[in-house]
Amino acid sequence: MSVMFDPDTAIYPFPPKPTPLSIDEKAYYREKIKRLLKERNAVMVAHYYTDPEIQQLAEETGGCISDSLEMARFGAKHPASTLLVAGVRFMGETAKILSPEKTILMPTLQAECSLDLGCPVEEFNAFCDAHPDRTVVVYANTSAAVKARADWVVTSSIAVELIDHLDSLGEKIIWAPDKHLGRYVQKKTGADILCWQGACIVHDEFKTQALTRLQEEYPDAAILVHPESPQAIVDMADAVGSTSQLIAAAKTLPHQRLIVATDRGIFYKMQQAVPDKELLEAPTAGEGATCRSCAHCPWMAMNGLQAIAEALEQEGSNYEVHVDERLRERALVPLNRMLDFAATLRG
């Protein structure tokens, strides 16, 4: 394993926090974005982890707020000629792979993902070459180049079902890049999985000691956990699942107070789903200067109103997502396998 990229020791180029806007500035950019979306025949596709004001704007303009799987479905099926993807770069790449005829814009092309950064394609190719007998399954949180090497792409919402299916066929798996999700899936399915050792900086910061203290303070609360979290956090959960699955769990659990261990961006849609329940952030490893993400992805936070307006107004190379056509065609194969498999689960 010494030749593998080590995400635990990597120093990620964290972006600066966006400059806060005044109330008047927010109103100005909101109206400008609404006008530009109409003029550009564009629609917004926003992830649950973007800031609440971005999700609200996507709702108001007929766009989509969802996890990465539904973002992929929505963008491919929507008649708009331009997709404004509010998320991180791999989401924009995925939109372009599935909709090559459309213009894909992002507020910034520098919105990274620690899972993507932690799985460089050269190192990953060497890892796969060393294990040619294994089926390669990669999480959606990867670059187009890594997807192009894969047999399957998967999201957390269907990970257990897909690996269970492959295991039933007797296939041995390479799983990348999230080690925590890989271990969770392995434990649920019993499959033979060899994990790449990546991690999400947000979920990796949840720690049992701090969560136990919060649980003791609110003993009547249920704990909801995303499986990108460490195993010890998952073991404390009343419900484990993807973003959309956690929102569904919030509605079905009888508890009136919920401790949520995932990016706090999810609170916007979760609170809509359970307006009468109290939502509490699961504590991260540190506070202030000692935590890296503080339960909110710093790259998701780059999707601000001003940046969205500029992307729609200026377009061009600073905002438009491009994927090499040969790479796109290769990455499309495992993505379509994922979408086809997901369709069978929906019946």
UniProtKB/Swiss-Prot annotation:
Question: Which keywords fit this entry according to its UniProt record?
Answer: 4Fe-4S, Cytoplasm, Iron, Iron-sulfur, Metal-binding, Pyridine nucleotide biosynthesis, Transferase
Q: Which InterPro entries match?
A: NadA (IPR003473), NadA_sf (IPR036094), Quinolinate_synth_A_type1 (IPR023513)
Q: Give the signal sequence positions.
A: none
Major localisation = cytoplasm
Q: Report the catalytic activity.
A: iminosuccinate + dihydroxyacetone phosphate = quinolinate + phosphate + 2 H2O + H(+)
Annotated iminosuccinate binding lies at H47, S68, Y139, A140, N141, S156, H226, P227, E228, T243
EC category: transferase
Q: Where in the cell is it found?
A: Cytoplasm
Q: What is its EC number?
A: 2.5.1.72
Q: Which GO terms describe its cellular component?
A: cytosol
GO MF assignments = 4 iron, 4 sulfur cluster binding; metal ion binding; quinolinate synthetase A activity
Cofactors required: [4Fe-4S] cluster
Q: Which domain of life is it from?
A: Bacteria
What HAMAP family would the database entry show? Answer: NadA_type1 (MF_00567)
What job does this protein perform?
Catalyzes the condensation of iminoaspartate with dihydroxyacetone phosphate to form quinolinate.
Record-stated family: Belongs to the quinolinate synthase family. Type 1 subfamily.
Q: What is this protein called?
A: Quinolinate synthase
